[in-house]
Amino acid sequence: MISTANSDSITPHPKGIHARVLLSSVFGPYARDDEFGSRAINPMELYHNQVTRAQGSFSLRMFHRSWGLMMIQRNISAPSTLLDFPTLERFEREITSTQYDVVGISGIIPNFGKVREMCRIVRKLSPNSTIIIGGHVAAIPALDKLIDADYVVRGEGIAWMRRYLGEDPAAPITHPEILSGFGMRVLGMRIPDKTRDTAATIIPSVGCAMGCNFCTTSAFFGGKGKTCNFYESGDELFRVMEHMEQSMKVSSFFMMDENFLLNRPRAMQLLDCMKKAGKSWSLYVFSSANAIRKYTIEELVQLGVSWIWLGLESPKSSYAKLHNTDTHVLASELRQHGIKLLGSTIVGLEHHTPENIRQEIEFAVGHGTDFHQFMLYTPVPGTPLFQQMQDEGRMLDGIDLADIHGQFKFNFEHAAISRDESKRLLDWAFRFDFERNGPSLFRICDTIFQGWKKYHNHPDLRVRQRVANEAAKLRTTYDAALWAMEKRLKKTNFAVSVRIRELRREIEHEFGGATRLVRAITGPILLWTSRREDRRLARGKTYEPPTFVDRRNWAT
């Protein structure tokens, strides 16, 4: 049965909040090609998957927990287990060691094969369990006819699960404590998972009101003009963040909201609370260009905006979020004020041709953002673009769902660019960005240093503290990393190596002899580990997340 959070067709489970619930992400391993839809090109790593994948040992490697499942588990009263990144054997062991009344499985569309296999296993080993499927995989048309599940849930899952367990779907949301990332590696070095150095994830809302035709998130949560706010006001958001600060010992927050700055009243309320409490927090946000322009630079700096994921898409696209904005000027201005940017560009829009596409990619790379994501224009089930392409008869036959993720080849017939050429163009875009702008780690250091120079004497103590916190690593490990990158690139990309050297020397001049001493000791180590890492990667080395088991509300 296809269902949504507001569906009247939900029949509550007879055991209500006494039902035993298992929530699980799809099974690993992930970074390999297999019969269940895993792909080596599509590892369980957001950055290395679709942002820094051409940067070798300089690539930022990390994993992220299944935040949606964590939100659901924290907001139901039933005894529950969350199994995150299990192996197939671990999943089987869990459903045979405990008799679960409900098994909820979450995945994305490329995970279809794994979701289907997990449903088969539950039916075999725990036949009395109710199977619920959620996440973006639920957008596949007629998914309930393709897999053996009782419910396929589209949209927001907390309210749905509460309703199913006989609880109030409109009860206030309790936010779980979530570290934004773990298992970080760069230059071949494993970075310890220290909470003080890692942002906490806050999810203020789901969905996006902009409603871009390709956007799976917007479509999944109601489409254009629709969002589901968990926290309506800046006051509510502040209380959640203050709790995280105290319990997790963090001072930075990753705001998992598709367009956080679009809700200006909420953001300004939050700023007012931060000022009154003297909070020197760093915020990592998603935003559109039109939303950013609602603020002055001083407001962004006061709010603690330290990093923005910015949709650039294409200079000739018609998306409302880009109207009347010179994105080159905007990107340069933000970075000059210490705000790091992750630009996102689409390859293969309708107007792209073999004659103009490289020029557009060069335009994108010219923004000089700290990171750059390139994604193929991809009609994903559930989106307006998918419906349009179906209506026009342009969806390609025989494309495996496991390959519909925007990082491989077109899944539709483009007017001017072939399926194979789409992959060559995408791969070139990542390589060109790396060759032109250098490692993202170098760019981050540059932006942080620009922010330090501009604001370390700012009259507001909160701002001074924040930029000092963000610049602290420039004095130590980041400077050493710059030296290692400079040496590694001297023979292969001399122009970028020179730029890195110039930045390093300026940093050492600013911060003095102690910084040079740390670089002299640590730099050669990072040079060696980065070379070792590139040798490992050349031999096919991959990384997988460990399995997490979280249990709540079980009687002792």
Placement of each model-derived feature along the sequence:
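Radical SAM enzyme core and accessory elements
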Residues: M1-L46, I95-T96, D101, N128, ...
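Acidic, low-complexity intrinsically disordered segments
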Residues: I2-K249
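Conserved beta-strand positions
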Residues: L23, I105, I133, M255-D257, ...
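Flexible glycine/acidic-rich beta-alpha junction loops that bind and position SAM and/or redox cofactors
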Residues: Y30-D33, I140-L143, P265, V347-E355, ...
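A structural motif corresponding to the C-terminal end of an alpha-helix
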Residues: I72-T81, S247-M248, A277, E333-L341, ...
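Structural recognition of alpha->loop->beta junctions
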Residues: D144-M161, I297, Q302-I308, Q359-F374
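Radical SAM [4Fe-4S] cluster-binding motif and immediate context
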Residues: M184-L342, V347-L349, E355-R358, E362
